[in-house]
């Protein structure tokens, strides 16, 4: 025997064991004959602890429990909708709808009504192989109001695909159409209720809350959904969560329950949280709020779930206004014309009883106190806007529109025929109509995307006791604020419920304890910033080219600095470079015009041009030091200038060496001197030194890089120093060391030739040039080891220009002076006389 067969056998057995239908009560609100019957499940009475009778097989007597005003109000909404449809000529013309309604007394009476609706008129449930042609007692069921009851009834009705539309059960479990294929509802699911609550708390910046739940499926499931939702954001934390004790039906709490409740209230009094979210049926809260009043709580914000958000009995405890502000999530307010008058009407319409139905009664189809109790609450029910009433009203109309399509109705008549539940279910899934200005349809999960309202309790009965302050759309998942809230606080200020106050901009959070909402605020230091959307608990470092001040939330571009033309040091160096360029050009012209004269030949002859050309090019390339550095300018700084300078130094050094050889070594080592001159020793030496310098430069560039970079100014982090790569400094120091060696050699050879003939004695000029080069190079190395930034660039450029000026003016300047102003000394005879004089002194 399969699972379905076993279920059917069990249901059939229960139908035989449970009480049989009773005698028809003609003037009962629970019955109305019609061509097609709708079943209605409502909670007219409720037992807080509903498990006491489940240990034995007996249907409870609901009228022995506490009456629920809202339950009776919702049952009247179904009666009103059916009668309105029966009086409508455009919807189901010629067809009368009937109803059978049962009091399920919350959780106590679920199975029996389901079986009652499921059975045929003879109270039998035959075991069939195919139930597609089976006609139960009703074609559809409206209700019940809570998720636990709805799931129980749906587990019975879904086997037979009997449409069931609940008007208040919000459990997300009901969205699973594999287990509940015939379940639909006219309210949004619990997920949307939770989302509306969370957005409400986020809007008012409440991040420290208390959650109180009932000890049942409703409390556990909703608190679980809230916890899941809060894990997606660290904006809201739960200070603590407690389970409320459920008293017996007498509402008298036992000592154990009283101690449990006292512990909860004591924690609530000691906590800094001032927002309390309560997921519980309203019957479990009467004792709780009486205790809240006894403890004299004030200044709290109570957020009600939909189960008690508009409960008139709780609202009737007017002293609750002193405990704080009451907010709740409920279905949108839609006024139904004529319903308020219908609710307190006692007479029934005189519809003829069709022969197609056989009315009977079952247990819990009476409520003697309902009408009088409802009248006493009539004013508050009218002012509240009949919120959940519209959910029942629209559920009946959804069935009516589906039946209208199924029967092929036109404007004047319908084709009455047998209607099987599965046929009606198919049509209900596709209904799409407008009712009192609202477009109604069911989505893929069987939910009707109705708007939710955030309401506030008011105790001025001249106004709506459940004033709407905001609206939530399940479609857009956004909360729209429409009214200001009247806070029950001094000066009408928004209550504060925060474990820690919000950090100021640019302050990061440092967690204190286990809750992310409890933290201390720390300033973000300069060079860091806080991006709250990315990480509120860590200050992020600014990129290398950017900077920030203390407590900044963004970084800004550092101010780039480099050598610019308008700066005084640049202007001074540019003037010196221009002086060097034009003086070198003049020297080059003078030496070219007097190339054959003894003065030019004694200065080096062709080798002079080997020195002057690099000097001229070097002075012309000085502008590469100015402006933002580039790969080309860094290459010139690291390679071009040092090679030019090395060529000049090597030429001076070899010229000094050659003069000493002529006058002091030629006689002693004639063969060596002959070899030196025969194989162009001077040019070989210059080429050799140049090759070494080029090799050093190329090796340094290959080992490092010449790409320019931006570096932070150590004295001012707001400034970005644009310069060549730091390895450029290392290469510069290395190259300067080689130049120092050449300077020392040139100075030594010049000193050795200090006693030579006057026209060949260049010791003082070379000494001047080499000493200046040596001193400036030492100064540059010392300066670079101490300073950084643009100053190094300026110093490097200044030393480079001065070194070239020292060579150009210090070495060639005196010779040009002699050529231009003492031409008589620039003759072969004069030079020969000087050599003869030197020879005679040495002999």
From Swiss-Prot:
Signal peptide per UniProt: 1-19
Membrane topology listed for this record: Multi-pass membrane protein
Subcellular location as annotated: Cell membrane
InterPro entries: ANF_lig-bd_rcpt, GPCR_3, GPCR_3_9-Cys_dom, GPCR_3_9-Cys_sf, GPCR_3_C, GPCR_3_Ca_sens_rcpt-rel, GPCR_3_CS, Peripla_BP_I
SUPFAM superfamilies according to UniProt: Periplasmic binding protein-like I (SSF53822), TNF receptor-like (SSF57586)
Free-text tissue specificity from the UniProt record: Abundantly expressed in circumvallate and foliate papillae.
Sorted UniProt keywords: Cell membrane, G-protein coupled receptor, Glycoprotein, Membrane, Receptor, Sensory transduction, Signal, Taste, Transducer, Transmembrane, Transmembrane helix
Molecular function terms from GO: G protein-coupled receptor activity; sweet taste receptor activity; taste receptor activity
Known glycosylation sites: 87, 296, 316, 355, 372, 432, 484, 491, 531
Extracellular compartment segments: 20-570, 628-642, 704-731, 786-789
Cytoplasmic side: 592-606, 664-682, 753-764, 811-843
PROSITE patterns in the cross-refs: G_PROTEIN_RECEP_F3_2, G_PROTEIN_RECEP_F3_4
Membrane spanning stretches: 571-591, 607-627, 643-663, 683-703, 732-752, 765-785, 790-810
Listed Gene3D superfamilies: 3.40.50.2300, GPCR, family 3, nine cysteines domain
Cellular component, GO annotation: membrane; plasma membrane; receptor complex; sweet taste receptor complex
The UniProt record lists the keyword Magnesium: no
Protein family (similarity comment): Belongs to the G-protein coupled receptor 3 family. TAS1R subfamily.
Function: Putative taste receptor. TAS1R2/TAS1R3 recognizes diverse natural and synthetic sweeteners.
Cited PANTHER family: CALCIUM-SENSING RECEPTOR-RELATED, TASTE RECEPTOR TYPE 1 MEMBER 2
Subunit structure of this chain's protein: Forms heterodimers with TAS1R3.
Full protein name: Taste receptor type 1 member 2
Upper classification of the organism: Eukaryota, Metazoa, Chordata, Craniata, Vertebrata
């Amino acid at each position: 025997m399969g699972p379905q067969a076993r279920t059917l056998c069990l249901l059939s057995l229960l139908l035989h064991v449970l009480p049989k239908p009773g005698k028809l009560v003609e003037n009962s609100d629970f019955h109305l004959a019609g061509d097609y019957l709708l079943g209605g499940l409502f909670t007219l009475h409720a037992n807080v602890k509903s498990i006491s009778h489940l240990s034995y097989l007996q249907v409870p007597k609901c009228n022995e429990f506490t009456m629920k005003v809202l339950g009776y109000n919702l049952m009247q909404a179904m009666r009103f909708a059916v009668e309105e449809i029966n009086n409508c000529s455009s919807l189901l013309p010629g067809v009368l709808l009937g109803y059978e309604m049962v009091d399920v007394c919350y959780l106590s009476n679920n199975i029996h009504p389901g079986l009652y609706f499921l059975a045929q008129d003879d109270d039998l449930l035959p075991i069939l192989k195919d139930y597609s042609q089976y006609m139960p007692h009703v074609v559809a069921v409206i209700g019940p109001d809570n998720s636990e009851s709805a799931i129980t009834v749906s587990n019975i009705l879904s086997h037979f695909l009997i449409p069931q539309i609940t008007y208040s059960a919000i459990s997300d479990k009901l969205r699973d159409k594999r287990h509940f294929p015939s379940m639909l509802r006219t309210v949004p699911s619990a997920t949307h209720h939770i989302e509306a609550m969370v957005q409400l708390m986020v809007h008012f910046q409440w991040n420290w809350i208390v959650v109180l739940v009932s000890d049942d499926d409703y409390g556990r499931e909703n608190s679980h959904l809230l916890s899941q939702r809060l894990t997606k954001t660290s904006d809201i934390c739960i200070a603590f969560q407690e389970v409320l004790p459920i008293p017996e039906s007498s509402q008298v709490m036992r000592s154990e329950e009283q101690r449990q409740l006292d512990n909860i209230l004591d924690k609530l009094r000691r906590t800094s949280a001032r927002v309390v979210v309560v997921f519980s049926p309203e019957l479990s809260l009467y004792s709780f709020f009486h205790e809240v009043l006894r403890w004299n709580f004030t200044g709290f914000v109570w957020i009600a779930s939909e189960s008690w958000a508009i409960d008139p009995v709780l609202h009737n405890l007017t002293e609750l206004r002193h405990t704080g502000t009451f907010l709740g999530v409920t279905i949108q307010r839609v006024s139904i014309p004529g319903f308020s008058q219908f609710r307190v009407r006692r007479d029934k319409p005189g519809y003829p009883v069709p022969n197609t139905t056989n009315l009977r009664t079952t247990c819990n189809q009476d409520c003697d106190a309902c009408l009088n109790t409802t009248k006493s609450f009539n004013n508050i029910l009218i002012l509240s806007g009949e919120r959940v009433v519209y959910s029942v009203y629209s559920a009946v109309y959804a069935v009516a529109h589906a039946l209208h399509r199924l029967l092929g109705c036109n404007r004047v008549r319908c084709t009455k025929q047998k209607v099987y539940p599965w046929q009606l279910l198919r049509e209900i899934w596709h209904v799409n109509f407008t009712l009192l200005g609202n477009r109604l349809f069911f989505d893929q999960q069987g939910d009707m995307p109705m708007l939710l309202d955030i309401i506030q309790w008011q105790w001025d009965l001249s106004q709506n006791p459940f004033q709407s302050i905001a609206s939530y759309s399940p479609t857009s998942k956004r909360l729209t604020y429409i009214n200001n809230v009247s806070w029950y606080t001094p000066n009408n200020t928004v209550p504060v419920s925060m474990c820690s106050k919000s950090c100021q901009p640019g302050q990061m959070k440092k967690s204190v304890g286990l809750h992310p909402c409890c933290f201390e605020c720390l300033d973000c230091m300069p060079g860091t910033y806080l991006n709250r959307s990315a990480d509120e608990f860590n200050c992020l470092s600014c990129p290398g080219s950017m900077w920030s001040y203390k407590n900044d939330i963004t970084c800004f571009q550092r101010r780039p600095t480099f050598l610019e033309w308008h700066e005084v040091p640049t202007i001074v160096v540019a003037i010196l470079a221009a002086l060097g360029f034009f003086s070198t050009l003049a020297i080059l012209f003078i030496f070219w015009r007097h190339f054959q004269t003894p003065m030019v030949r004694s200065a080096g002859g062709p080798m002079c041009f080997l020195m002057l050309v690099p000097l001229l090019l070097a002075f012309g390339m000085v502008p590469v030091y100015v402006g933002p550095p580039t790969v080309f300018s860094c290459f010139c700084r690291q390679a071009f200038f040092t090679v030019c300078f090395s060529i000049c130094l090597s030429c001076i050094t070899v010229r000094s060496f050659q003069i000493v050889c002529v006058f002091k070594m030629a006689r002693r080592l004639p063969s060596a001197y002959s070899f030196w001159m025969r194989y162009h020793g001077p040019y070989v030496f210059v080429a050799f030194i140049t090759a070494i310098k080029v090799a050093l430069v190329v090796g340094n560039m290959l080992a490092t890089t010449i790409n320019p970079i931006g570096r932070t100014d150590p004295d001012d982090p707001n400034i970005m120093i644009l310069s060549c790569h730091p390895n450029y400094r290392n290469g510069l120091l290395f190259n300067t060391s080689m130049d120092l060696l050449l300077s020392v050699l040139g100075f030594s050879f010049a000193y050795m030739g200090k006693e030579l003939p006057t026209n060949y004695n260049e010791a003082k000029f070379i000494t001047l040039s080499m000493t200046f080069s040596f001193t400036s190079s030492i100064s540059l190395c010392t300066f670079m080891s101490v300073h950084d930034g643009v100053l190094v660039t300026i110093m490097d450029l200044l030393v480079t220009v001065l070194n070239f000026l020292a060579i150009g003016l210090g070495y060639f300047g005196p010779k040009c002076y002699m050529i231009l102003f003492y031409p008589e000394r620039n003759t072969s005879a004069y030079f020969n006389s000087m050599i003869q004089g030197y020879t005679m002194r040495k002999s």
